[in-house]
Amino acid sequence: MPIRDQIIQIVRGHDLTEEQAAEAMEEIMTGVATPAQVAALLTALHLKGETDAEIAGMARVMRAKAIPVHFDGPLLDTCGTGGDSAGTFNISTTAAFIAAGAGATVAKHGNRAMSSVCGSADVLEGLGVTIDLDAAGVARCLEQAGIGFMFAQKFHPAMRFVGPVRREIGIRTIFNALGPLSNPAQARHQTLGVADPALAEKMARALYLLGAQHALVVHGHGGLDELTLSGPNLVIEVRAGHKPRRYEVSAGDLGLTPAPREALLGGDVSTNVAIVRAILSGEERGARRDVALLNAAAALVAADYAADLREGLQQARQSLESGAALARLERLITVSSINR
């Protein structure tokens, strides 16, 4: 079905099947669809409301069009959809180093700031990591440092057909959901934060359709796209071969001290770099450390290193207190700079 017919179908209030969504994405990612058609499709989907099948179908094509990163072994990603406008520091990036220090191999996929001041690419660059590596460079980091970063714009060349349209229409679209589902290293273990609780269910079902091995989709109290300390957090756990399981978790349930969102605020790149370093070095002992530990615990559950969040917290604390998490950062800085 041509994308023109799919636009008409959506405008009439009908959902696309996973296959139809994939067909539309194929036209977009190959430049067959015109900019006007891309804008119309994205806007129509936004107004109708994207389904899990539509998200999965388009993500499947986006994965296929990405430049692949090859690694022999299970991989973990920690990321979020963004859009919470909360101004927190780079929690999932900090959690990635803690999880790596506990033994998980982390293939982090991210970009520069979109809705915030400092994205994962920005803070990693500020920390001294070389962020614009090719696939071979990232694979080397995974093998030698236990963690690697894939700069999204480097690995998704087909996005050149979409980027200008997204900037011009200026609304959140299905592509905000697709980024976290399009890891070029095909990481099948994942924590995925969403700011919109309605999107959490859709993302969990999309991950299931895409064959995730083990993933935790989280929606933080107060509308954050991270687990937070201020109240009950929604978790939807996805395991291969099992229906997604929904539950809530609070900081107090795990022995962590509750704290308001304001205690997790970050700032510009230099501020967030200092915060990440303070946590990984053991200098920071307050709420920022606790929220990084909590999100690292979730990552370790998703990576199948921990049976539950309580065990994950123990492993995360050990990673920090032993210096292993900081060592992963220092090693990534070194390995990513080879042959630069």
UniProtKB/Swiss-Prot annotation:
Classification via InterPro entries: Anthranilate_Pribosyl_Tfrase, Glycosyl_Trfase_fam3, Glycosyl_Trfase_fam3_N_dom, Glycosyl_Trfase_fam3_N_dom_sf, Nuc_phospho_transferase
Reaction equation(s) it catalyzes: N-(5-phospho-beta-D-ribosyl)anthranilate + diphosphate = 5-phospho-alpha-D-ribose 1-diphosphate + anthranilate
Documented EC number(s): 2.4.2.18
Species for this entry: Roseiflexus castenholzii (strain DSM 13941 / HLO8)
Binding residue positions for anthranilate 2: 166
Alphabetical list of Pfam families matching this protein: Glycos_trans_3N (PF02885), Glycos_transf_3 (PF00591)
Protein name: Anthranilate phosphoribosyltransferase
TM region positions: none
GO MF annotations, alphabetized: anthranilate phosphoribosyltransferase activity; magnesium ion binding
Residues at which 5-phospho-alpha-D-ribose 1-diphosphate binds: 80, 83-84, 88, 90-93, 108-116, 120
Residues binding anthranilate 1: 80, 111
Subunit structure of this chain's protein: Homodimer.
Residues involved in Mg(2+) 1 binding: 92, 226
Keywords for the protein's UniProt record, in alphabetical order: Amino-acid biosynthesis, Aromatic amino acid biosynthesis, Glycosyltransferase, Magnesium, Metal-binding, Transferase, Tryptophan biosynthesis
Cofactor(s) needed: Mg(2+)
